[in-house]
């Protein structure tokens, strides 16, 4: 006799027993894919299955399942947006560089190949971020720090990261609410980033830290992946 014990999504089989009319447990053979077989006795049998919730496991050893950014990191890893920094680590508290941010965005966009003459002396052809920078420059998502440099290893501020996201979304500043003024450090938001920050607040991509936006603080890898998750998880 074959029985199938298939749990609902998010659950796993914890225990499965088959007993005869006398309460004797019958031997089950696991055939894989949730199927089990047993020898049917000359009597009725009772089948009992217990299911429990699956234990959530993190894709990276330094990302706790209870961290505010866990779902974002998990989403980004599943989407191929990030593979971490190696050795099973994500580096959530490390500052995110300009190269990393445009690479995350490029991958979120589907890693498009563009025909664009890139003249950035500090972006080596063949580097992991070269095609991402080429795309970002061609789409106006990012600009160089000078006419022929991109500064790929420079740390990105929260304001700069939000500006990249805003440009990629191609939002119109004229449609935005003025929300930045509700934060105590509103005056420290760079002028170029004001439309982007208002957009990010309106879309709940950025929520601030209490009464502060901290626009000039370094944007961590956990933060940029969280911004991306909030902006593009349903796209």
Residue ranges with predicted function:
Residues 1-4, 67-80, 89:
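Extracellular/luminal Pro/Thr/Ser-rich low-complexity repeat and linker "mucin-like" segments
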């Amino acid at each position: 006799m074959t029985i199938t014990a298939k749990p609902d999504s998010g659950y796993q089989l914890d225990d499965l027993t088959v007993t005869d009319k006398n309460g004797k447990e019958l031997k089950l053979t696991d055939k894989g894919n949730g199927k089990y077989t047993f020898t049917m006795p000359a009597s009725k049998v009772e089948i009992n299955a217990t299911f429990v919730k699956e234990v959530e496991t993190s894709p990276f050893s330094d990302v706790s399942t209870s961290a505010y950014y866990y779902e974002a990191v998990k989403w980004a890893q599943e989407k191929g947006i990030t593979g971490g920094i190696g050795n099973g680590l994500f580096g959530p508290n490390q500052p995110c560089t300009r190269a990393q941010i445009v690479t995350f965005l490029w991958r979120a966009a589907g890693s498009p190949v563009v025909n664009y003459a890139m003249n950035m002396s500090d972006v080596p052809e063949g580097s992991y971020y070269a095609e991402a920078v080429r795309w970002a420059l061609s789409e106006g998502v990012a600009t160089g720090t000078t006419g022929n440099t991109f500064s790929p290893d420079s740390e990105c501020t929260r304001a700069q990261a939000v500006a990249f996201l805003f440009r990629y979304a191609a939002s119109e500043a004229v449609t935005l609410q003025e929300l930045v003024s509700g934060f105590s450090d509103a005056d420290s938001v760079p002028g170029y980033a004001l439309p982007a920050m208002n957009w990010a607040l309106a879309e709940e991509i950025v929520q601030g830290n209490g009464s502060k936006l901290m626009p000039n603080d370094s944007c961590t890898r956990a933060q940029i992946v969280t911004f991306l998750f909030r902006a593009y998880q349903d796209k």
